[in-house]
């Protein structure tokens, strides 16, 4: 102690905070100066001091100490903004799903990391003595990333498969998580629980296998005499300085190291910290060191090849069991690390990139010939540098040069103005050979059904020559042109050939062709052709002879349109399968009649009305109620107006309410208050009790009325009703009490008491209530009475001329009650209930006879007068050749849909099979091109029918005073502007005919507020000129005289009006694809993506389509023009993803490497390097030597690569394992070779595993070439292929190993530790090693005899004894003679 005190006086006094790293350094220097005993004494004092201080400080942790970083809010906002922009780009087709995922993850990872860095500075500035800060940054408990989760943001998490979830947890644990965030973070928590349970056992098993492989490796010699070594250098950037120092310290040099002429270190010198610092200072050449790889032995190792012992810092002692130390050093951290489950966000990054920023504002210049355009990993456009590129940034008085290395991305253009701190280039981080990546497949699925088109050429993948898998050679879009396939089951034989033009009736409300399964083909044919085939019914033939004339079939009916005021617009609400167009009538009348509701016209999607269809309705506000209640019709019966067979269009709609037609002039509404409560609610009132207004029913609900409470418990909830009214306890003489559930009219006497009698003023409802069996009382409830008028006069609603019943179409007004008799009505809070609806019903039941049924087709006509545009609803009466085939109660049948199309010039072969005469029917429904498809299921023929029922159009008309403004609805219903449903191709929900878009030109001057009477018009229709394009790019001019008909598609056209005369900036040709938000006219960006089909002088027709971006190398599934269904796979991207550094994925990876399991994909860069290597080496060294040296170097390189892979996983978790431990393991698993078929069958059998050095030696001794292949044995296989069968049998497969050993007559020489432990012998390590040393010294003196009588004996001696100098890898053959007693050796020598 005196010596220590004396020395202490001379020591330097340091006053600074010591963290964990500084503590490690201090301890190592103390050991160097004072040795182990003194150091432990000093450290005891440090420990005591620490405990004293901690007790005195008494740091506690309160919730207020968790302070969120103030900059978090704007950082998260910024990241969200970036994500939003990214989402937009993905929607427009600028980036594909993989790029979006990558970028999204990097945005959030960067935000999270930045927040973590901010956290430390924030604590340091605001609260340096914060306990959380002190603990986490002292290294005592917790680390910054854990504290970051408490006060920063939790960030990105992995799912159970280890894939990153791209939805980050933005909250921290202090603020609390939302429900979604909680569920995502539960993944991590569950992972942690599973890891501790499962992975701990995995780690233990890993340790056991590792020790099994190397338990016999003991230090038995000082020097094996090898001259080989491994070169280490820190120059090429593959190794950081820290790793370089760790690799060198404790090693032994394999060669002298010179600095110029001067030798600064000699061979076999062990490397300490001073020597390493000298190497770094002098920037010495690559340094050759000895490693276990270069040792000439297999079953032991020499001191110099192992180096310093990690425990006491000197060269390792003889007899040290370094194998077991190595096995435990690798296995043990795994056991510790399973307790950590942290998720690093850099999963998708292939090495982070450095950014070069502009130092000041200025113009950038570079040589454009040295770069070529490309895409970055995030889908941004950039330039890739071929070679190092000099970039000049010029400001007014400064010129700045930047050198950008090759393979970097330049993110700006030549001569572009850049701002200060703008990122101008991204330097790729040098990815090392061993940065193993995996190839991941990402499938992109179609969002909608439609037809697939490519905007570039594609290649067939060679393995799928006859399949439908294609490879993309360059970046391009895949377009899914929207539309739906239709299948016909009734006509399984195909009458239409591919590319035939035909007329097809529109789809049903469901947009599916599902026919009645019960109808056979014969029935269909009979139905189709039993009606008059010549089609000569009165006025129903369309004449197409005139070039510019359409003669209509006489049945024209108009409904009064809206007057479009300035800034007003027609609005359509999409409801189920119909369109509702609210119609405004004259404003003065509107105020009188309908204070707050308008008339709505309801048109089916296919535009066809049947008999008794409702054309328009309006909801009278007089018949609205806010409260719940019961409707009663009194005693008069009613009948439902909507019969079962008329419900086809409503089938499948849950919200359908049948309407009841009234024959009565009044009905009654009995109000009641209803609350539907969850089953677990605590109800604060009793059943049958009487409460007042505003009584508390549950904790947060109060009653709105007073009265009797009835509670009814259902399966899942509780229904609580409150009946208002008087309670009446009946006397014996009371008449009312005998009745229950009846309405009593006013005027009836009500006996209140014996004395007075009173007459009722209003209707009342009497309800008898029996709380117990004997008692009962009567509740008298008030009733609201509604009178219904006989029908509103149509004149008040519509102008006079509508009411003239023209041409078979009649309109009548009907009032419907929307609720049936006695049905309780439940009012949802704040919405009113409409009790009565007034409807306008179409009547057309003149023709009762059989096969033909009347239909009314609705279409819109646009009329322009004096610059004002009006839309008229036009009704056409059409006779349908087929009535609906409907089987009652058959849910699958939605009826056969007739084709009432005119067969122009025999376009439709369906008719021509049966009749040579051409059938010309009125008003064809949907024209389309038919394309036969690859059938998905062979039983039904698939047809694709393009129909233009989804037309929309933009109207930039010049000189008009109306604007396309969508009014907001008060309830916020989604409103569809009706403009978008009108267009050159058709009518609102369907095409009545290809030319049903008319400009009605009139020669009479018409005033705005007057209605256009049809008789004033001369029926001259201007037909627009179009260009049509089919899939093959042929362009047609659809004259009436020719057969070409447009192929429209379901729901997917819209129209864009554009004045080409004024602005010819963009030339648009048919077939061109247009992305969303691209400006094609000066009126602003175009709002939908699609393909241009028709170019007109002032408009375009665009078929809507969705683009999907695909980059080169992506695989496209499906054929050009194939019909895709929603959810089909469109593209498969293959991208590289760095393996996760998470230990829970890390441990299996370590195990995967050590067990040498085949990984799904070899690292791309390693594959390329091996190919290049095989080409170059033989070229340099000539054929035989090149291949031999190449094979040797490949084995060496693969060993180093394995070591680096294992180190990488541990280093990512901050665990330091010395390379030499891993090298000992790797040496064992790479030291075997497999004898090939052509091998020496007289010595080794083919397929036998032998040691590499032993194979080489045997070949030299017998002067014959042995063919063998280097193999990597997994640690389990290596454990079962050792020299000792006892060791193998005690590991696994005991019976098999022992049986095999017995059959082969194997001898176990008990060299390892395990065999001796099993049999209770002395372990040949440590003190038990001295016997071995003594023996080996004697054997070293045996002379080598070359010439002997028996040559074979000499050769065998070569094989078996030369291993003293060149130790062979001799596992499988029992060649362990050097452990036998000495007499046997003498005998062998004398023979």
UniProtKB/Swiss-Prot annotation:
GO terms for molecular function: DNA binding; DNA-directed RNA polymerase activity; zinc ion binding. DNA-dependent RNA polymerase catalyzes the transcription of DNA into RNA using the four ribonucleoside triphosphates as substrates. Its main location: plastid. Binds 1 Zn(2+) ion per subunit. One of its GO terms (biological process) is DNA-templated transcription. It holds the Pfam family RNA_pol_Rpb1_4. Gene3D superfamilies: 1.10.132.30, 1.10.150.390, 1.10.1790.20, RNA polymerase Rpb1, domain 3. This is DNA-directed RNA polymerase subunit beta''. Zn(2+) binds at residues 224, 295, 302, 305. In plastids the minimal PEP RNA polymerase catalytic core is composed of four subunits: alpha, beta, beta', and beta''. When a (nuclear-encoded) sigma factor is associated with the core the holoenzyme is formed, which can initiate transcription. Keywords: Chloroplast, DNA-directed RNA polymerase, Metal-binding, Nucleotidyltransferase, Plastid, Transcription, Transferase, Zinc. The gene is rpoC2.
